[in-house]
Amino acid sequence: MQVAPQYSEALTNNIERTYTYAHVKNVHGLEVEPHNYDAIETFNQLVARDPFGTFMQLDSYGFKNTLRALIRYDIPYTAEQERKARVYYEVTQDMERNRSDVSIGYQGDIAGTGIVKVDDPHIYTTETTIKSKRFIETLPRNKKTFNHIHVDKVPKPLLDSAEQFEALKNSVENHVSCLIGGAGTGKSFVTSEIVEQLMLNEKHVTILAPTHKSKSALQQKLKRGTVSTIHSYVYGRSGETDVIVIDEAGMLSSELMAKLASVYNGEQLVFVGDKNQLPPIGYGRPFEVIQELFPTAELKANRRSEAKDIIALGREILGQPFNANIAQNNIYLVDTAEEAFKLGAEVLLTFTRDGVKKANEIQRIKGEPSIHKDFSIGDKIIAKTNTKRFFNGQLFKIVTWNKATDGQGNAVTFRTPYELSNNFDLAYGLTIHKSQGSEWDVVAYQPSDKDTKNLAYVAVTRAKQKLIIVGGFPPQFKEERDWTHL
């Protein structure tokens, strides 16, 4: 008889978040009494049947992480099970590498893998890509709702902006709509008012975000409503809803869209995002298609009163028109990361992990140690895992020997040195990808010749008051490669 594995805290929390009672009942059809439900026990039962498929439903568990986990926890699997998972991984990796909904010329056996042929016998895609595509295509294009705008409840700044008011109407009055806008355009403000107007129309509104980090960021800007992750909504859905608002929709992959499609029941949909931010992790770019097919309102005017030159620089990087007469009083150029930190940089953003490592070594506090020798009291740290106590990308500061706080009333206590080092990194230097969704007053950006326009745009627009460029820009930033849609 096989002994049940003792999973790490991070994996245990991941299992409990994903394999909720509602999930196993709705998705797997298991008949379990709610009062007797045990997520870990149920997970182990499912793993015994389908080790790869069960693990790969967890957050951040692709083929490689799943294979490592199966080996680490001594979970048996067959060669056939590994083959199926590996084929899926290889084909989807090829799709991501070639920025396409299809993979051309794959030679392996695709039977039972979730990979399917597309017309031509040498062109392949995934079942979830097909599902995502069909879901989008079957949504009503120009269907109107019976909602109306409660003008007396609209804030004056929004009423005074024709652009923002039209965006509000577009999302409230259309059954499927998009709201897009770059940094500083007031997208979150308008999103909050969309939710408010829908609730005034007595609608039950579900607000979703792709990650815990984006969920937290939006929650702070809403008047009303509670934000959930798409993952928790799909796997733990209970009760009816009238409207689904999806923030950071540019982070939707085909897999995530297909999961949404599996629980969709005709609700009004509002997609919100910045078309110039970084693409999703995973294959597919469904938000690009949605913008083309459904009523879309774009916010263009800069509403940020401070540091307009930073927003203008972000637009210049993208090749968009801006007011060339704006004084660049908030942008500084220095030669080294050390100089940037002396000018008050709270964080240095760069494409390379080597640059992140150097920034962390420069700024780390070399004072009273914390519970782990590599971290000191006063150090800024960033979570790199999701647990019940913190989420991936959440920023903290170590305040005592074994405690850190995030400045918003949340604290985490470390019971062992490894609980700190396994779940957190220093946060003086971050990759640009890791910074998306966060803002700081003073940001240093160290460009590289690997940066695309979108990477540079995201890095620049993380700064609210002061931007410090380290080493200067390359002659030109690379174009983000277009995604080829099915």
Which role fits each region the language model picked out?
Residues 1-486:
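Conserved ATP-binding/catalytic motifs of P-loop helicase motor domains
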